[in-house]
From Swiss-Prot:
Basic and acidic residues bias locations: 69-78
PANTHER family assigned to the protein according to its UniProt record, in alphabetical order: CELL DIVISION PROTEIN KINASE, CYCLIN-DEPENDENT KINASE 16
GO cellular component, one term: cyclin-dependent protein kinase holoenzyme complex
Biological processes annotated in GO: exocytosis; growth hormone secretion; neuron projection development; positive regulation of autophagy; regulation of cell cycle phase transition; regulation of insulin secretion involved in cellular response to glucose stimulus; spermatogenesis
Topology class, membrane: Peripheral membrane protein
Residues annotated as transmembrane: none
Compartments where found: Cytoplasm; Cytoplasmic vesicle, Secretory vesicle; Cell membrane; Synapse, Synaptosome
Residues covered by the Protein kinase domain: 165-446
Function description: Protein kinase that plays a role in vesicle-mediated transport processes and exocytosis. Can phosphorylate CCNY at 'Ser-336' (in vitro) Plays a role in the regulation of insulin secretion in response to changes in blood glucose levels. Regulates GH1 release by brain neurons. Required for normal spermatogenesis. Regulates neuron differentiation and dendrite development. Phosphorylates NSF, and thereby regulates NSF oligomerization.
Entry protein name: Cyclin-dependent kinase 16
Source organism per UniProt: Rattus norvegicus
Modified residues (Phosphothreonine): 175, 380
Amino acid sequence: MDRMKKIKRQLSMTLRGGRGIDKTNGVPEQIGLDESGGGGGSDLGEAPTRVAPGELRSIRGPLSSAPEIVHEDMKMGSDGESDQASATSSDEVQSPVRVRMRNHPPRKISTEDINKRLSLPADIRLPEGYLEKLTLNSPIFDKPLSRRLRRVSLSEIGFGKLETYIKLDKLGEGTYATVYKGKSKLTDNLVALKEIRLEHEEGAPCTAIREVSLLKDLKHANIVTLHDIIHTEKSLTLVFEYLDKDLKQYLDDCGNVINMHNVKLFLFQLLRGLAYCHRQKVLHRDLKPQNLLINERGELKLADFGLARAKSIPTKTYSNEVVTLWYRPPDILLGSTDYSTQIDMWGVGCIFYEMATGRPLFPGSTVEEQLHFIFRILGTPTEDTWPGILSNEEFRTYNYPKYRAEALLSHAPRLDSDGADLLTKLLQFEGRNRISAEDAMKHPFFLSLGERIHKLPDTTSIFALKEVQLQKEANIRSTSMPDSGRPAFRVVDTEF
């Protein structure tokens, strides 16, 4: 009888603690048990079913994945052992312990979990049954998400599929691409679909590849958002956020007279988006009003990165056939291929002037005429104003008249002295002398916007500040209504 009690005690300890039976206590390593549970009259001499201590543990499974075991009615005896295993307990053989398995329900996954995990917009509508499917298979949320798993998850939601988007209106067409106004079935929001035709011999145009590679890494409130990329055998479709119009259309709608407070807001946002690009070592290289998009709230965003480049060093040789002629700096017009972020700053100055006056500053139709317009207002450069210019072969070939510089205020009377000073700092002959986007944002011209506007996170709009509001235009006419008779949005200049 004592032997039976020892066996019962050891078995109880094994089930309670998950430990093997001590081989040094005189009990055999393998314990014989009657299949019926071991009644008081069991015959220990019969051939037993043998269970090794390790097998007892394997029944429970690994500790990390074992269901929680709740012991019931575990009354303790005076010797610190449970009554079931105590030497003072009844001689009747009973089940050593009674256990109740507690199975935790699967973690319930919410739409917010999905949005945060996959960086999705807050208003996305997930496919029917998608949350329930993930709830049944939730380990995805307990470990890092691999690139492959992320792609699979996005595809299951509907990203990367043409059928997710509805084409509404055709907005424009270029050599390689057509732009449509569309609607997303995932969010019910309007989108711009830039459909790039893939030539069988050439594949995707390098400008499209460049735009995709840069935009997917640029996350800023003043840079157009690339929502999705759809690749088929015949086309590459880029899905952009939809904005109501571009700056050129905004100027037209205002009768080419923009409220000067709004000019300041637009210019600040242009500089803010550009400063972010330059910090990321990206040059836009094609700034013009048609590539600056504006929504009804007044948010301005940089678009069309088809000519943009990532730069690795301050100056590098690139093609000089960039930037629409009116916004092209004189050093590039004269053949320079060594430039950096300063190439964008000249274009900012031209756009600033155009917003303030309603007309382009240098509307040349040829390179020679463009330089003539520049020199007539800013003065023909000399060795004093532009060291080394006289050794430039193209400059000597044109043989321009000796113009004297004119005061910019005489051409842009709506600018105050701070505005004229900022414009002068942007329109410098030499790229190295042009003010940077980061420094331009700190110019006194923007003091009236307050200090908080400089402390916003990159992805936060300036209109998140209650003190920043777009003012109503005096002569604005709406062209964003469906019956206006012309497209209200131009996502990019698609002439690659």
